[in-house]
């Protein structure tokens, strides 16, 4: 009897253990599913955006297992720089460990392997932009800013040229005007409303010897406002640009895509900009590189003012002779290219493509929309808003607003709270955001209703971008920017909104 009892007891205990294991498994599965679903603040969230958020739970898996370097931080500065993944870095350095790479200015085995992977990186970039090497050239640079400087130095300016740019451009785009005026060209800024008129197709009378350049961002980096990419063909194929210039000429278009491409697809077949600048660290955190993508037909017309190793076939010492490389990228990539960083692009694009840029677009829009709705609903006890939000969020249009929520904080009387106070408190909560003007003076000063005279007066009182002066005469000199990206989660949104309520809502 005792043996039978013990056998029955063992079977009973085994059943309990098995049942507990099953219960534990399904409980964890349920909790994971619950976690994958955003805790939405408005009733239609799941029906509107449920299929867009989280890559079917993959975002949480990546955050848990592949981004250990976050260490509990809330990262909300994707427009400043993207985030790399642990596996991305491991695979890149595994590639370095298992292969011998060398200066590509040679035909040695190691150099040949290096060249092959560098060329593969160029092809991957062009494929990402839906074009080929038959139409565009990839010139590697240190950053988007370095790309813009290269273009500024090499563009064929003349006395009759006009450099036209929108107000909401980055400082690095504005800075091109110094090179333009050096060559006798003029510059002019335009507002969005100035670009709404239509142009007429060319009648064949334009002066091909006069080169004009129009620059605008696909998405401006202050508040995330998106521009209409149809402006590219409007300037290229009609006489629209000539209304701004003193002399008719050929218009080229520079597209600053640095803030745009980390969360949006850029199709150069549909929107064939003449020049495109990109920063890869904004796409996927590593490597820290940029590129200038140029139409092949334009490369021969660009000036190469000097030369260096890698850009010439041969030069003489006693007379001014230098035979430049015939290939466009080789002509403008001075010295030895950062080949190890360029090789890393291959693995970095693999990680991005695991998710897909279109899925990243949907996910980041979902996060942005929810963040805006939550922040916009926060009120002081007297009903006054806690934040003033800039941009096109109120349109609720994916095509008009990028993944940025830029704001200024308000007290319960409607006065501004300095952005430095927000930054200090955010640092205390291990929240990564950005404050200031974000190198976009046009968008920043317009948001705060500052004219050029006020800008000159007020900013002459500052000593640096990050000094303590953030409000003068009750007017903010910048703002607070929260930007999201591929790996932002609803948990990040919840933590930031909780932070706002904790520090800035009156009690």
Report residues per predicted region.
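N-terminal signal-anchor transmembrane helix specifying type II single-pass membrane topology
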Residues: 1-30
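Pyridoxal 5′-phosphate
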Residues: 23-507
């Amino acid at each position: 009897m005792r043996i039978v009892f013990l056998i029955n007891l063992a079977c009973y205990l085994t059943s309990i253990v098995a049942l507990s294991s099953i219960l534990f498994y399904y409980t964890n599965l349920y909790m994971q599913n619950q976690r994958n679903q955003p805790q939405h603040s408005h009733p239609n969230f799941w029906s509107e955006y449920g299929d867009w958020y989280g890559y079917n739970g993959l975002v949480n898996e990546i955050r848990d297992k592949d981004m250990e370097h976050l260490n509990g931080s809330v990262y909300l500065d994707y427009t400043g720089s993207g985030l790399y993944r642990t596996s991305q870095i491991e695979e890149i350095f595994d590639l370095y460990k298992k292969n011998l790479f060398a200066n590509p200015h040679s035909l040695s085995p190691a150099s040949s392997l290096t060249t092959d992977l560098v060329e593969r990186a160029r092809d991957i970039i062009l494929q990402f932009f839906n074009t080929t090497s038959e139409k565009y050239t990839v010139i590697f640079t240190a950053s988007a800013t370095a790309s813009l400087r290269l273009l500024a130095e090499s563009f064929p300016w003349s006395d009759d040229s006009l450099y036209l740019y929108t107000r909401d451009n980055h400082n690095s785009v504005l800075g091109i005007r110094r090179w333009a005026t050096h060559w006798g060209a003029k510059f002019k800024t335009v507002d969005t409303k100035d670009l709404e008129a239509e142009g007429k197709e060319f009648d064949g009378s334009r002066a091909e010897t006069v080169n004009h350049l129009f620059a605008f961002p696909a998405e401006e980096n202050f508040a995330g406002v998106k521009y209409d990419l149809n402006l590219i063909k409007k300037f290229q194929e009609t006489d629209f640009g000539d209304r701004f210039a003193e002399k008719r000429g050929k218009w080229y278009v520079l597209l600053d895509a640095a803030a745009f491409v980390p969360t949006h697809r850029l199709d150069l077949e549909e929107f064939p900009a003449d020049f495109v600048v990109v920063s890869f660290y904004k796409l996927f955190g590593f490597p820290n590189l940029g590129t200038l993508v140029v139409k092949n037909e334009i490369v021969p017309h660009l000036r190469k003012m000097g030369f260096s190793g890698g850009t010439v076939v041969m030069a003489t010492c006693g007379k001014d002779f230098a035979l430049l490389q015939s290939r466009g990228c080789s002509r403008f990539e001075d010295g030895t290219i950062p080949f190890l960083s360029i090789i890393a692009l291959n693995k970095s694009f693999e990680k991005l493509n695991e998710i897909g840029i279109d899925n990243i677009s949907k996910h980041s829009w979902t996060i942005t929309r929810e963040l805006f709705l939550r922040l916009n609903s926060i009120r002081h006890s007297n009903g006054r808003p806690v934040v003033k939000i800039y941009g096109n969020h109120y349109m609720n249009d994916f095509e008009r607003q990028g993944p940025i929520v830029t704001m200024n904080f308000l007290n319960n009387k409607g006065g501004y709270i300095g952005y430095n106070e927000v930054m200090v408190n955010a640092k205390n909560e291990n929240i990564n955001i950005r404050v200031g003007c974000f190198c976009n003076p046009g968008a920043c000063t317009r948001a705060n209703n500052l004219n050029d005279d006020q800008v000159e007066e007020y900013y002459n009182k500052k000593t640096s971008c990050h000094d303590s002066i953030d409000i003068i005469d009750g007017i903010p000199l910048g703002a607070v920017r929260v930007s999201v990206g591929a790996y932002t989660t609803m948990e990040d949104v919840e933590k930031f909104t909780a932070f706002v309520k904790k520090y800035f809502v009156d009690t």
